[in-house]
């Protein structure tokens, strides 16, 4: 092993560490001693490190770890750390320097500055050589909560928890371990349930947005309170949830199709590469989103028609589909498809770019202390990036909605995407392309909050472990 430690020396070192942690000297290290010891030694997050140690080697966590169990864990741990050290030591000179740290992050799609790489190195460099040798690496990570450099990406994974009613974002990344253990589908299910609850909770604002996109104009100055009042007067309070059923129903097929398409497209783009760069993720995510939208798009048209329906206009989902087919033909199910697909590029691109920018800014400022930014930072960055994506793609979303609703407006002109854009700009100006954006923004915070709470509870119910 690099570093020249004999087996006897390693066991002596492990024994000394065990004695440090065993504060009551009963020959076992229990959960409380482990937590207190890790906090005292400054070895990362005590909760997560303690979970990793006890889950690996002790059948009875309450009983604590014996010296033998603790030694077995550290032996296996050092072997994994040595493999990680070798993978980061690109030139195999026995030391990790600043440039190798930058290369490792770059391979994961994260761009960090020289100053930030030096901060990371300083946190482990005890002898002031501006490099990290095996002993420094081992001692820093032996009981540290991070398994590898990719844990930084785990914390920053753009999660399905942020469901704000639009499915145009780049899909989530799942590790090989998550795929092999089946955690990936549990996380997708948790995300789908969270999305369903979130969309149901914010359905009145979503219906108001669609209502204002289609009906608001210079001559019909529809505001938020006026729109809600009109809908309640026409169909009662429950009418505020019209169209929500199919909006929830389409979550599962769209998420599944997008995930499968993303994995296949990633494989084709990646080739022999280990990881995808941010630009490649954007291309793969956009193509996967376009694939999913192409397949489920008839459900989008049905959602718009059902959302805008008058009381008694349709008996239900199947009746709506039947009437559209009979009166307008199969092409009606793809009305507005072009602006919808074109909207994926600005939405997913800006969403991903803003998220990566915020992530890199956080890493440059704070990651020398911890790779985990905390849930408030994650939710804040996700909300800001999604909102920026929405602003950029909103005019196309409005044109799409109006085209989907064309046949449901009596005497409404059947115009193309370009024709509709020209009509809106000439009659209402640029602001006309942003009708309904106020209720759209109003639903972002409650949607994100609801989906996060439900997502975390669903993960717990399904047995999804957090690293």
Curated annotation (Swiss-Prot):
Modes of activity regulation: Activated by an increase in cytosolic calcium levels that induce a conformational change of the N-terminal regulatory domain, uncapping the channel and allowing transport.
Binding residues annotated for Ca(2+) 2, in chain numbering: 89, 91, 93, 95, 100
GO biological process, one term: mitochondrial calcium ion transmembrane transport
Residue ranges of domain EF-hand in the record: 9-44, 76-111, 112-147
A cellular-component GO term for this protein: mitochondrion
Membrane-spanning residues: 188-205, 243-262, 286-299, 336-355, 379-396, 436-455
Swiss-Prot/TrEMBL keywords: Antiport, Calcium, Membrane, Metal-binding, Mitochondrion, Mitochondrion inner membrane, Repeat, Transmembrane, Transmembrane helix, Transport
Solcar repeats, residue ranges: 182-268, 276-361, 373-461
Residues reported to bind Ca(2+) 1: 22, 24, 26, 28, 33
Entry's localization field: Mitochondrion inner membrane
Molecular functions per Gene Ontology: adenine nucleotide transmembrane transporter activity; ADP:phosphate antiporter activity; ATP:phosphate antiporter activity; calcium ion binding
Annotated region described as Linker region, given as residue ranges: 149-158
Segments of this protein annotated with the region Regulatory N-terminal domain: 1-148
Mitochondrial matrix side stretches: 206-242, 300-335, 397-435
Reaction(s) this enzyme catalyzes, per UniProt: Mg(2+)(out) + phosphate(in) + ATP(out) = Mg(2+)(in) + phosphate(out) + ATP(in); ADP(out) + phosphate(in) + H(+)(out) = ADP(in) + phosphate(out) + H(+)(in); AMP(out) + phosphate(in) = AMP(in) + phosphate(out); phosphate(in) + ATP(out) + 2 H(+)(out) = phosphate(out) + ATP(in) + 2 H(+)(in)
InterPro entries to which the protein is assigned, alphabetical: EF-hand-dom_pair, EF_Hand_1_Ca_BS, EF_hand_dom, Mit_carrier, Mitochondrial_sb/sol_carrier, Mt_carrier_dom_sf
Family listed: Belongs to the mitochondrial carrier (TC 2.A.29) family.
Primary role: Electroneutral antiporter that mediates the transport of adenine nucleotides through the inner mitochondrial membrane. Originally identified as an ATP-magnesium/inorganic phosphate antiporter, it also acts as a broad specificity adenyl nucleotide antiporter. By regulating the mitochondrial matrix adenine nucleotide pool could adapt to changing cellular energetic demands and indirectly regulate adenine nucleotide-dependent metabolic pathways. Also acts as a regulator of mitochondrial calcium uptake and can probably transport trace amounts of other divalent metal cations in complex with ATP.
Domain notes: The regulatory N-terminal domain/NTD, binds calcium in the mitochondrial intermembrane space and regulates the antiporter activity of the transmembrane domain/TMD. In absence of calcium, the apo form of the N-terminal domain is intrinsically disordered and binds to the transmembrane domain, inhibiting the transporter activity. Binding of calcium leads to a major conformational change and abolishes the interaction with the transmembrane domain and the inhibition of the transporter activity.
Protein name: Mitochondrial adenyl nucleotide antiporter SLC25A23
Organism field: Mus musculus (Mouse)
Upper lineage: Eukaryota, Metazoa, Chordata, Craniata, Vertebrata
Gene name as annotated: Slc25a23
């Amino acid at each position: 092993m690099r570093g020249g430690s004999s087996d006897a020396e390693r066991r002596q070192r492990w024994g000394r560490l065990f004695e440090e942690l065993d504060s009551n000297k009963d020959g076992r290290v229990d959960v409380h001693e482990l937590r207190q010891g890790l906090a005292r030694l400054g070895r990362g997050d005590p909760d997560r490190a303690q979970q990793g140690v006890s889950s690996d080697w002790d059948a009875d966590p309450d009983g604590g770890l014996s010296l033998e169990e603790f030694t077995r864990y550290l032996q296996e741990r050092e072997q994994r750390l040595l493999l990680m050290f070798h993978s980061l030591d690109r030139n195999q000179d026995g030391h990790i320097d600043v440039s190798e740290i930058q290369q490792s992050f770059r391979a994961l799609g994260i761009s960090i500055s020289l100053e930030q790489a030096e901060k990371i190195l300083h946190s482990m460099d005890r002898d002031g050589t501006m490099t990290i040798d095996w002993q420094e690496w081992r001692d820093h990570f032996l009981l540290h909560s991070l398994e590898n450099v990719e844990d930084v990406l785990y914390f920053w994974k753009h999660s399905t928890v942020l469901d704000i009613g639009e499915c145009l974002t780049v899909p989530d990344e799942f590790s090989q371990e998550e795929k092999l253990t089946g955690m990936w589908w549990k996380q997708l299910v948790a995300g789908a349930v969270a999305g369903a609850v979130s969309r149901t909770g914010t359905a009145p604002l979503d219906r108001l947005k669609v209502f204002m996109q289609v009906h608001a104009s210079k001559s019909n100055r529809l505001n938020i309170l006026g729109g809600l009042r009109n809908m309640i007067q026409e169909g009662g309070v429950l009418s505020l949830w019209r169209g929500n059923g199919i909006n929830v129903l389409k979550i599962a097929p769209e998420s599944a199709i997008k995930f499968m398409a993303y994995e296949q497209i990633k494989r084709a783009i990646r080739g022999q590469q280990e990881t995808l760069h941010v630009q490649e993720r954007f291309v793969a995510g956009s193509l996967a989103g376009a694939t999913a939208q192409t397949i489920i798009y008839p459900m989008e048209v049905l959602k718009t028609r059902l959302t805008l329906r008058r009381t008694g206009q349709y008996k239900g989902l199947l009746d709506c589909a039947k009437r559209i087919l009979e009166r307008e033909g199969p092409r009606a199910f793809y009305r507005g498809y072009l602006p919808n697909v074109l909207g994926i590029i600005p939405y997913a691109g800006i969403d991903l770019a803003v998220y990566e920018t915020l992530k890199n800014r956080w890493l440059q400022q704070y990651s020398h202390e911890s790779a985990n930014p905390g849930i408030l930072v994650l939710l804040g960055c996700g909300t800001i990036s999604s909102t920026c994506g929405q602003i950029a793609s909103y005019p196309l979303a409005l044109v799409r909605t109006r085209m989907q609703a064309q046949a449901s407006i009596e005497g409404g002109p059947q115009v193309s995407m370009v024709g509709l854009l020209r009509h809106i700009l000439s009659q209402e100006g640029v602001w006309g392309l942003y009708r309904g954006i106020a209720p759209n923004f109003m639903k972002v915070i409650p949607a994100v909050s609801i989906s996060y709470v439900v997502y975390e509870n669903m993960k717990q119910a399904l047995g999804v472990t957090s690293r």
